[in-house]
From Swiss-Prot:
Top-level taxon in the UniProt lineage: Bacteria
Keywords, sorted A to Z: Ribonucleoprotein, Ribosomal protein, RNA-binding, rRNA-binding
NCBIfam families named among the record's database cross-references: rplT_bact
Annotated SUPFAM superfamilies: Ribosomal protein L20
Keyword Ribosomal protein: yes
One BP term from GO: ribosomal large subunit assembly
A GO term from the CC aspect: ribosome
Name the record gives this protein: Large ribosomal subunit protein bL20
GO molecular function, one term: structural constituent of ribosome
Organism: Salinibacter ruber (strain DSM 13855 / M31)
Family, similarity comment: Belongs to the bacterial ribosomal protein bL20 family.
Tagged with keyword Lipoprotein: no
Length: 115
């Protein structure tokens, strides 16, 4: 009796990996063994970077708010300390966006918070 290999499932599994490896360079996109390793590593990077993305954006927002508040002779930590005590309720993302795209509105916020 011949050996059963379940060829359709094997082909589907390999084709799925090779499709995910499209756009990779050289053997990474053509050879199953190499492509499988490259795809797994790519998925690991994607998982890690989805989490790092949140940290990086928070750092960017803090940097932008800090730069904008220092133009008004206030440090970031002083501003945020007073901001939490104030009646305003905006997150860092919105504050950073205002600091970059609408400096006049941000100046009013700084004045309101620091009074």
């Amino acid at each position: 009796m011949p050996r059963a290999t379940n060829k359709p499932a094997t082909r589907r599994r390999r084709k799925k990996i090779l499709n995910k490896a499209k756009g990779y360079w050289g053997r990474r996109s053509k050879v199953y063994k190499v492509a499988k390793h490259a795809v797994e590593k790519g998925l690991q990077y994607a998982y890690r970077d989805r989490r790092q993305k949140k940290r990086r954006f928070r750092r960017l927002w803090i940097t932008r708010i800090n730069a904008a508040t220092r133009q008004h002779d206030v440090s970031y930590s002083q501003f945020m300390g007073q901001y939490r005590k104030s009646d305003l309720d905006m997150n860092r993302k919105v504050l950073a966006d205002l600091a970059v795209h609408d400096p006049d509105a941000f100046e009013q916020i700084v004045d309101h918070v620091m009074e």
